[in-house]
C-alpha cells in the first residue's frame, strides 16, 4: 500500500470514530473527544480513556485501551489486529462499550 493510500484509509478510520462519538453524544453518552494531529483521545465519564492513533511508518492504526494496546494493519479490505486478526471497529466497539458502561457501536466508513 502506498503512503497516500494508507493516509486516505487511516484518516477515514479517524473520521468514522469522530462521527460515531458525535452521534453517541447526541444520545445517552458523554464522551469527550480530542484530536491532536493523527491522535484521537476518547475520555469517558468515569475518566478512562481510549487513544486511537496512526502510525504512518508502519502503515498501522493503534488502539490503547484499558484492555491493552493493539496494532491494526489493512488486510483484505479491513483493518485487522496484527496478532489476533480481530477487525478494528468490532474491537473498538467492545473496548468503548466496556469503558463507557453503555453500548456504543463503531462501524467501518
Swiss-Prot record:
InterPro entries from the UniProt entry: CyaY, Frataxin/CyaY, Frataxin/CyaY_sf, Frataxin_CS
Domain of life of the source: Bacteria
Keyword Iron: yes
Keywords, comma-separated and alphabetical: Iron, Metal-binding
Keyword Transcription annotated: no
Record-level Gene Ontology MF annotations: ferric iron binding; ferrous iron binding
Gene Ontology biological-process entries: iron-sulfur cluster assembly
GO cellular component, one term: cytosol
Role played: Involved in iron-sulfur (Fe-S) cluster assembly. May act as a regulator of Fe-S biogenesis.
UniProt similarity note: Belongs to the frataxin family.
PANTHER family: FRATAXIN, FRATAXIN, MITOCHONDRIAL
Protein name per the record: Iron-sulfur cluster assembly protein CyaY
Underlying gene: cyaY
Amino acid at each position: 500500500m502506498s503512503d497516500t493510500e494508507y493516509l486516505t484509509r487511516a484518516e477515514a478510520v479517524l473520521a468514522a470514530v469522530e462521527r460515531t462519538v458525535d452521534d453517541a453524544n447526541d444520545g445517552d453518552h458523554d464522551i469527550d473527544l480530542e484530536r491532536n494531529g493523527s491522535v484521537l483521545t476518547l475520555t469517558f465519564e468515569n475518566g478512562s480513556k481510549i487513544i486511537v492513533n496512526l502510525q504512518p511508518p508502519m502503515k498501522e492504526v493503534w488502539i490503547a485501551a484499558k484492555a491493552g494496546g493493539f496494532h491494526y494493519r489493512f488486510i483484505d479490505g479491513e483493518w485487522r489486529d496484527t496478532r489476533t486478526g480481530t477487525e478494528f471497529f468490532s474491537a473498538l466497539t467492545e473496548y468503548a462499550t466496556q469503558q463507557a458502561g453503555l453500548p456504543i457501536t463503531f462501524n467501518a466508513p
